[in-house]
Amino acid sequence: DILAAFRVTPQPGVPPEEAGAAVAAESSTGTWTTVWTDGLTSLDRYKGRCYDIEPVPGEDNQYICYVAYPLDLFEEGSVTNMFTSIVGNVFGFKALRALRLEDLRIPVAYVKTFQGPPHGIQVERDKLNKYGRPLLGCTIKPKLGLSAKNYGRAVYECLRGGLDFTKDDENVNSQPFMRWRDRFLFCAEAIYKAQAETGEIKGHYLNATAGTCEEMMKRAIFARELGVPIVMHDYLTGGFTANTSLAHYCRDNGLLLHIHRAMHAVIDRQKNHGIHFRVLAKALRMSGGDHIHSGTVVGKLEGERDITLGFVDLLRDDYIEKDRSRGIYFTQDWVSLPGVLPVASGGIHVWHMPALTEIFGDDSVLQFGGGTLGHPWGNAPGAVANRVALEACVQARNEGRDLAREGNEIIREASKWSPELAAACEVWKEIKFEFQAMDTLDK
C-alpha cells in the first residue's frame, strides 16, 4: 500500500474518525451516496482505509490521520495519477476546515515502476569530474530584461571566476527581450570559452520550460545539439507529465536536469493546508530531476533546519528511517533509485558559506545570485570570492575545524589573501534575514 499522513482539521462538530474516513473514501472508491455499481466490483480490495488517528500536540481540533491506499489504484510510473487520486478532490470537502498532506510512504513495488532522476549524484560528479566539495552556482541577475548577448557575457564572467554552474531564473523562458534560441547560443559560447580558459567543465541551466510539451522538447533537443551538459525545468508550473517526459529524454541523451520549484510555496507554506514540500520532493525524485531547490535554512526563503534536513535526506539517501523530530512520518526505501542534489539558493552570500557547507555537506549545489553579481568589483570577482570561501571552508572542515563555531574566523582568514573575498565580506557583513519560519515541527 501507499501510506499517507494527513493533517486534518475537521469542521466543528465533525468527529475525527468521520473526517479521516471521509478523506480515505473520497481519495479512493467513495462517493456521496450508495450506487448500484458498487456491487459490480470488490470495494474491500480497492478502498482506502484510515488506519490510525493521533491528535496534534498543542492544537485544539487538529489530527494526523493515516490512510492506506491499495497499489492497484495507481497507474505505474505516473506521479500525475498518484496525485490525482490522493489529493485531487478531497481538499475541497465541506466537512473539513483544512487538510494537509504531510508525508507519503511509497512502497518498493511502486518505486520500481519509475525511472527517477536522469543520472543521479555519482554520475553527475563523474560527468563533471568534480569531487569532495559542494558545487557552486549562480542565478543570472537581473532575471528579466537583459539581451541574449549581455546575458551570455554575465554567464561567461561568472564561470571564468570559478563557479561550476550558472542558471536561468525560473521565469526566463522566451520573452520578447530575449528569445530562447538566442540565449542558448550565447550561453553555449560562454560555457566553451570559460572551459577553455579554466580547464574545468562548466554548465548553465538552460530553462527548457515552455507553453507546450512539444516546445519544451524542441528546446531540450537544441541544447543537446549545442553539446551543453544540463537543462532546466520548472516542474510544478510545467507539470509532472511534462517533467517525466523531459527526464526520460535527458537520460537517453546524456543531459543533466536541474529542477526549479517555482509555485511550491502556494502549495506547501501554510502549516494546516496544502501539501508539505517533503511530499513534493519525493514526487520529484520519482518523476525525475538531478537537482532541486530545497531552501537554505540561513537565507531569505522559508525553511526550518530540522525539516529541511529531513527532506534533503529523502532526496539524497537510499534508505531513510522514520524520524518525527525531522518531520519524517514513514520509513522510505528507494531501492537504489538515483539521488537528487539539493540546491541551496535565495539570499545567501559569503558569510553563509561555513553554515551552508556544514548543513548541506558535499552532495549539494550552493547557488549565489545576488551574492555573486552584487560584488562591488563585478561578476568574475564575485565568483572568485565565493570559490575562495568554499575552498577555505572545505579545507577547514577536512582539517577537523568546527564550521558552526569557527565559520566567521575561517572566512576572515581566507579574506586576508583574497582581495575579492575581503571586498565581499565588507559588502555583506550586515545582511541578515531573521524571520520566524511559518512551517515548524509539532512540539
Swiss-Prot record:
Alphabetically sorted, this entry's keywords are: Calvin cycle, Carbon dioxide fixation, Chloroplast, Disulfide bond, Lyase, Magnesium, Metal-binding, Monooxygenase, Oxidoreductase, Photorespiration, Photosynthesis, Plastid
| Catalytic activity line of the entry | 2 (2R)-3-phosphoglycerate + 2 H(+) = D-ribulose 1,5-bisphosphate + CO2 + H2O; D-ribulose 1,5-bisphosphate + O2 = 2-phosphoglycolate + (2R)-3-phosphoglycerate + 2 H(+)
Q: What is its EC number?
A: 4.1.1.39
Q: Where found?
A: Plastid, Chloroplast
Reply yes or no: does the keyword Ribonucleoprotein apply: no
In the record, what terms sit under GO molecular function? magnesium ion binding; monooxygenase activity; ribulose-bisphosphate carboxylase activity
Protein name per the record: Ribulose bisphosphate carboxylase large chain
What organism does this protein naturally occur in? Villarsia calthifolia
